[in-house]
Amino acid sequence: MTDNVLKLSRKNIKKLIPYQSARRIGGEHGNILLNANESPVSIFFKLKKKPFNRYPECQPSKLISSYAHYVNLSCNQILATRGADEGIELLIKAFCEPGKDAIIYCPPTYDMYRINATIAGVEIKEIPTIKNTWQLDLLNIKLNLSRVKLIYICNPNNPTGNIFFKKDLIFLLNITLGQALVVIDEAYIEFSPEESMTNYLKDYPNLVVLRTLSKAFALAGIRCGFTLAKKEIIQTLSKVISPYPISIPVSDIAIRSLEKDYVQLMKNRVLDSNNNRIWLINQLKNITCVETVFESNANYVLVKFSMFEKVFETLWNKGIILRNQNEKMNLKKCIRISMGTRSESLRLIKELKIFSKKNMCQGEMSEK
């Protein structure tokens, strides 16, 4: 009977491997979680007493106006969503015809662009970034624009941590004008705010920017994000969003987080994270089992290790949970490390030094 039920599912879903989120693949036993690019510290809000027997506004007006003020845009340019992930999905729903249109995504990058397109039955054109520099392969993107409706760019890119050249993003916007939307996922932009593309929304009707409160705002648990675009795009997305995407508690917490004092606290946390990243990178460069530390503009660092599997497993068993990137395109032997507190980073470095000393003494460090 179960087999008969499973036959009812769509063919592409039967073959689909779901997104392997940090919580989905385990590691909850760990006491140092450096695998999901979350804030290592939490902020707390006292919820207002409100009745919950009525549905919320589809787009809570106070939330929209608060975020509009934060990003210096008009309210009609903003759609509140369940994390930036919902924005990724809505764009495909609203703009791509299954079996006809395509998206471009540029691995190694965030997998949800590809997964959402697969679920929707939309073709995926994979244009890898240039190896080692991780910059966009503009020539191949230009040659593959046929039938493309959406181009997803994560900036800063996850998991590599690099920023894409602004001139390349502008070039992309120009060559796709009237043909495709360029979607810049700025989930980590608060860590490099000068690189944001929001100022270009007034110049390019084909630009869409995705944002979230999950990272710098330390609110991954409430799932609140935003899509920023021309009002016509926002109106189109509003046709396909669920009736009540933002719950009353989520809206209340998000509004509080966007108040002046809390925004300043967020900026202070970002400064601490960026300083900790600089410190961690310098420390990692002196660890024997580390081959390469890639520069980063976000709250994580990509590191290439010798004996990477043994490094990952050893730290895992000690309760330090990192993110294995070995299966990602061009990221062999790489592990992504989220920024933790300074004490967590000190513990990580201590364990890596112990590991290196032990394995160097055993003559195993030459294994590549």
Curated annotation (Swiss-Prot):
InterPro entries: Aminotrans_II_pyridoxalP_BS, Aminotransferase_I/II_large, HisP_aminotrans, PyrdxlP-dep_Trfase, PyrdxlP-dep_Trfase_major, PyrdxlP-dep_Trfase_small. Its cofactor is pyridoxal 5'-phosphate. Pfam families: Aminotran_1_2. It catalyses: L-histidinol phosphate + 2-oxoglutarate = 3-(imidazol-4-yl)-2-oxopropyl phosphate + L-glutamate. Disulfide bonds: none annotated. Its EC number is 2.6.1.9. PANTHER family: HISTIDINOL-PHOSPHATE AMINOTRANSFERASE, HISTIDINOL-PHOSPHATE AMINOTRANSFERASE-RELATED. Homodimer. This is Histidinol-phosphate aminotransferase. It comes from Buchnera aphidicola subsp. Acyrthosiphon pisum (strain Tuc7). The gene is hisC.
